[in-house]
Amino acid sequence: MKRTILQKAAAAALFVLLTAALLAAADFLLVDDVHSYSRVMLQELYADAGNIDTLFLGSSHCYRSVDPAAVDAALGTHSFNAGSSQQLPDGSYYMLRETAAENDLKTVYLEMFYTGYNESRSANVPMACYLLTDHMSAVSPNRYEYLWEMGGLAAFADLLLPARHGIASPRAMPALWR
């Protein structure tokens, strides 16, 4: 009995759905992001959309040092701290774009600790990119532009199994990041 085009399409769709479900289950089982600061920060960023007028960007020095509530009390602003671990200049750029897409920003502060500028791009430190993009909105163009800049097609392949992000490095997988 010949299979119709509709049956073949249904089989392909079922395969894609089962593969996606399997990858989602593996992600759930292998990646513990319950305590991920970046996940919480980005959830709060999206929940606060339209209200932010002052933004703080930078590495851990920023997110551990700036208290938006104290800034708001002193300046009468509605500030947000979008700092994250290992945030490099390109990460700050994409966080600025992500925030500016939904907010009318008046002031942006960029923390510039010197060791953060030993590497200017996340292509040399993939985890710096993944800490942000893993939790950015799935419909955000900034997420995909940042991933493309960091690792090209290889970075998109890594979206399928985030458990790999802990081992992703240019030295460990040289052909992948060229």
Predicted regions and their residues:
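A broad, low-specificity signal for short, low-complexity segments enriched in glycine/proline
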Residues: A13-A20, R39-Q43, P68-A73
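Hydrophobic membrane-insertion alpha-helices, especially the h-region
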Residues: Q7-D27
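Secreted/periplasmic serine-hydrolase-like ester/acetyl group-modifying domain
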Residues: V125-R178
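Alpha-helical transmembrane signal-anchor/signal-peptide segments
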Residues: F28-N51
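N-terminal Lys/Arg-rich, disordered targeting/topogenic segments
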Residues: M1-Q7
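Membrane-embedded segments
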Residues: L57, H61-Y146
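Acidic/glycine-enriched edge-of-secondary-structure segments
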Residues: L23-D33, H78-Q86
